[in-house]
Amino acid sequence: MNFDNTVHESNFDDLLHNPNFPPQFDQLELDSLLYGTDESQESTSSSSFGFSDQNAGFRSRDGGSLGDSSSDSSPPLSCANFTENDQEMWDFGFQSRSPFENFEQQFGSPYQDDEVIAEPTNEFMNARYLREEPAKHLPMQQKRIITILPKQSQPVKRIVSRPIQKVYRVKESPGSQQQTYRVVQPLMPSPSQATQRQIKQMYYNEPVQEIHMQPKSGPLVRQVSEEPRYVPIAPTVDIKAEPQVFTSEQNRKIRNRMYAQASRMRKKEADEHMKMNLQELLQENEILRTENAALKQRLAFFEHEEPVVEVPQPFGRNQKKKRIIAAGSVLMMFGLFAVISPFNVDNNLNINNQIMAISNETSMVARHGRVITYEDSAPVAKIPTQQPIHNYPNSTQNDCDMYKLNATETIRVNNDIERWVQVHSFDNVPMKFSGGLLNKEAMRKFNYAQKVKPASVYGPQTLAVQKKSEQAALRSRERTWKQLDLLKTGNNIQLDNEKIQRKRQDIDKIASIVRQKGDTLYIMTLQDYVLLPSLIKGANSVPKLSLLLPSVPMNGTLQDQYTLLRVDCEVTGTGQLTLSNKQLSYLMP
């Protein structure tokens, strides 16, 4: 407003205390002074002002309107008639809050948007200052009408569940499983119910009992809470659960925990075992202490007795008696030693140096420069059979008339076996005749080749050499054959006899399986064989074995005869071994 050409701010307090307040103030409408526009504000229910649609103004307690000079009940509000009561009501109108601020908290329902009817704007609605102009009769404009439509809220239900101190079992139909029920605490209320309870407690301090809405007509129905009072426990039967899959890291951790737990259990058991042993030893020690104390008491009791007095004997007689007892003891020990000793003294003293009997049928002449012939050989005598003084059944010394070979016979037997092994070895058999071990056809062809070529690798074999010239010629031929053997190289043999080399490797494998000894001959026969069992069997006698093997004839054989080599053996041990079919297939003809 412009008073006396001076612009003042729109401060209501300054206007009221201004002494130069214009007398035309009673003609102004309070709506424009209070709010600056023609819009009206809502009034609270606690205020003494009421909003009226007829005069669009405020009425006081006595019914008069504020700011309307047309009212007959009260004069218009001015500085002269603005009383103290009006001042208080005026201040209250500015201090009171809107009644719709806590609408949602009071009624528990969301606040709905107000229906506002907008009226056409005019040039006076946005004016901040009022000028003194002659009143113009403007057409009556409609004020904004605010209609509050509260949302109907459902009655709040409060369900209070009390815990029951009993456990019930409900027996269902025979086809269904039994379920065990247990008592649980009341479930937590829903968030909406908790909010409603908090809102009610904000405005009501005393407990409020729920009043259920009943129908106007019809029988009374009691509303029962649908909240479950019992929660079923899992059934007692096993439930098939899917196997849980763990990662490698989880499996490693589980294994580590298992191993650690097992280690702790073992340590605990070991500690308990040690404690038990310690307890037993302590008990045994206590028992021994008790017995020792008892023995000491008995010893002390006997020590108090008087000692027995012995009459001393002469010194010479006692010394002689001791010597006799010592000599008798020595003789007794010597006799026991002679009886129990495993050494046969008599047999060792009665050893005869004569050559033992050897069967002439199996004797052969070896290839040596100096060989004793059959005619010039000394007579061989048999050892007279006599029973020794000490005959031990467990000893193998005198069982079955065992013979002992002298140096000459030992050399002869070794040469015979070595010759047989060399003839039947893979290296000395010609490749065109080699068909496998113990192959009869191969042996027949080999014998025929030996007849055609009597001078073999080993030289000619004769019964006796009487003249020195013949002996010299024989030695020269042997040297010649040895030199020819030295000219052969191993490469040619390997190139020509690849199959034989493979068989040799297989035989080496078999020898490693058998654990071959250096001084033992091992013979494997894989074709038909004939067994001649022993006629006399003894449990304490050493078993003997005689092998009959095909051999090379010495001086030629007849058409219907075949030469065999007999090998007498003494069994020193037996054992079993396992060979594969592939290894045996190389040895089969």
Swiss-Prot record:
Induction: Expression is repressed by micro-RNA mir-124 (at protein level). It comes from the Eukaryota. Keywords: Coiled coil, DNA-binding, Membrane, Nucleus, Transcription, Transcription regulation, Transmembrane, Transmembrane helix. Its main location: nucleus. Belongs to the bZIP family. ATF subfamily. One of its GO terms (biological process) is determination of adult lifespan. One of its GO terms (molecular function) is RNA polymerase II cis-regulatory region sequence-specific DNA binding. It comes from Caenorhabditis elegans. The chain crosses the membrane at residues 324-344. Residues 250-299 form the bZIP domain. It is a single-pass membrane protein. Transcription factor. Plays a role in the unfolded protein response (UPR), perhaps mainly during constitutive endoplasmic reticulum (ER) stress, by activating transcription of genes involved in the UPR. Plays a role in modulating lifespan, acting by positively regulating expression of calcium-binding chaperone crt-1, thereby influencing ER calcium homeostasis. By activating the UPR pathway, confers adaptive protection to subsequent exposure to hypoxia. Involved in protection against proteotoxicity, probably acting via the UPR. Residues 1-82 are annotated as: Disordered. Residues 271-305 form a coiled coil. Residues 281-295 are annotated as: Leucine-zipper. This is Transcription factor atf-6 homolog. GO terms for cellular component: endoplasmic reticulum; membrane; nucleus. Residues 36-54, 67-78 have a biased composition (Low complexity). Residues 252-275 are annotated as: Basic motif. The keyword Transcription regulation applies.
